[in-house]
Amino acid sequence: MADTFEFEIVTPDKLVVKDVAEQMQIPGKNGYLGILPGHAPLITELSIGEISYTLRGETKYLALAWGFAEVLPDKVTILAEAAERPEEIDVARAQEAKKRAEQRLQTSGPELDYQRALNAVKRAEVRLQVASHATSKAAVGH
């Protein structure tokens, strides 16, 4: 069995990443899924969350808004509504989006789409978490 698998993450706008990994964590609808080479074939819906993948001891991260994953023994394809690398995330904008979404949750009435506001908060939190990986790498000189 191979030690790695290929993967790609695609949005409607672009190919976000095409790489090789030894392992990957993806945010499934019912929790995170761990992917290793030789994984059983699977198609699954993905939720808002952090994607991580590791190659030669280095772990990289991406923020995922929503999507689907096709997992094959030697390849993973993720079709995402939106996906961002840490260096692409505008931290100030993500903080402001989180603040606005939290304020929406404080309102009440028929105009409040509660689930949409919760998703906006979660997405902003994930973006900030992924962005923090870039900050911590810069601090240690990577």
Curated annotation (Swiss-Prot):
Keywords from the named record: ATP synthesis, Cell inner membrane, Cell membrane, CF(1), Hydrogen ion transport, Ion transport, Membrane, Transport
Highest taxon, organism lineage: Bacteria
Stored InterPro entries: ATP_F1_dsu/esu_C_sf, ATP_synth_F1_dsu/esu, ATP_synth_F1_dsu/esu_N, ATP_synth_F1_esu_C, ATPsynth_dsu/esu_N
Listed CDD domains: F1-ATPase_delta (cd12152)
Predominant location: membrane
Pfam families (UniProt xref): ATP-synt_DE, ATP-synt_DE_N
Record Gene3D superfamilies: ATP synthase delta/epsilon subunit, C-terminal domain, F0F1 ATP synthase delta/epsilon subunit, N-terminal
GO cellular component: plasma membrane; proton-transporting ATP synthase complex
Subcellular location field: Cell inner membrane
Gene Ontology molecular function, alphabetical: ATP binding; proton-transporting ATP synthase activity, rotational mechanism
Keyword Amino-acid biosynthesis carried by entry: no
Membrane topology: Peripheral membrane protein
PANTHER family (alphabetical): ATP SYNTHASE DELTA/EPSILON CHAIN (PTHR13822), ATP SYNTHASE EPSILON CHAIN, CHLOROPLASTIC (PTHR13822:SF10)
Quaternary context: F-type ATPases have 2 components, CF(1) - the catalytic core - and CF(0) - the membrane proton channel. CF(1) has five subunits: alpha(3), beta(3), gamma(1), delta(1), epsilon(1). CF(0) has three main subunits: a, b and c.
Role, per record: Produces ATP from ADP in the presence of a proton gradient across the membrane.
Similarity remark: Belongs to the ATPase epsilon chain family.
Protein name per its UniProtKB record: ATP synthase epsilon chain
Organism: Koribacter versatilis (strain Ellin345)
